[in-house]
């Protein structure tokens, strides 16, 4: 077998699987959805997942690979134990339901005045954030999350209590040409609406 042929086969094998940045998230996903028991999660296995259900996420969670679950619906509730979170939501999810992201945490309770760093990236053209889409379990009054909407040019509908009663979105990144539309929409509970070109992270 030629070296180039071998490289192509290795690359093909590598590309069959989802490669998680966060090893604890990887463990959780393999435990839930590794059907063939090979200790890895293939893209084919991820594509078979529709109902994510309740997921208890680890501390300092990064779940960018959620974007690879291309058939997952919005039947999901993420429970985060702190506000050091980054998650990339796949493009087919366009309505963000009640309790989509729940910050129910000992750390938040102990550090109620500390500003959090949760980043929720929604790749779809979002239509609606429903009641308590983002929620926490106490009067956490400081800004603790940012929303990134790279493909939502028209402001979605925001339920007046989309981020619970106390949550504060410190930054909402939107398409550059839509900043003024979002500002005119008077989205409740958002401190800063910024152009996506100023977002420094990856998605």
Where do the model's predicted regions map?
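Enriched but not universal
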Residues: 1-14
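Acidic, glycine-anchored loop motifs typical of Ca2+
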Residues: 34-45
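Amphipathic alpha-helical segments that form the core helices of the histone-fold
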Residues: 46-60
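Structural signature of tandem-repeat unit edges
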Residues: 15-16, 58-98, 104-128, 138-156, ...
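Acidic glycine-/aspartate-rich tracts in secreted/extracellular proteins
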Residues: 34-36, 177-180
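Disulfide-bonded cysteine-rich modules in secreted/extracellular proteins
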Residues: 14-28
């Amino acid at each position: 077998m030629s070296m180039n042929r071998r490289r192509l086969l290795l690359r093909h094998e590598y590309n069959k699987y989802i490669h998680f940045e966060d090893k604890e998230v990887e463990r959780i996903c393999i435990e839930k959805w590794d059907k063939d028991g090979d200790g890895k999660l293939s893209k084919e296995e991820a594509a078979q997942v529709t109902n994510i259900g309740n997921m208890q996420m680890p501390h300092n969670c990064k779940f960018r690979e959620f974007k690879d679950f291309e058939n997952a619906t919005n039947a999901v509730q993420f429970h985060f134990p702190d506000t050091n979170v980054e998650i990339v939501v796949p493009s087919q999810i366009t309505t963000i339901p009640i309790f989509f992201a729940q910050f129910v945490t000992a750390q938040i309770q102990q550090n109620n005045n500390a500003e959090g760093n949760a980043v929720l990236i929604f790749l779809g053209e979002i239509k609606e954030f429903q009641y308590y889409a983002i929620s926490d379990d106490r009067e956490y009054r400081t800004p603790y999350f940012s929303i990134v909407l790279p493909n939502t040019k028209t402001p979605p509908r925001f339920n007046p209590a989309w981020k619970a009663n106390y949550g504060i979105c410190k930054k909402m990144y939107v398409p550059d040409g839509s900043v003024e539309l979002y500002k005119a929409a008077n989205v409740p509970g958002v401190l800063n609406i910024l152009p996506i070109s100023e977002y420094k992270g990856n998605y």
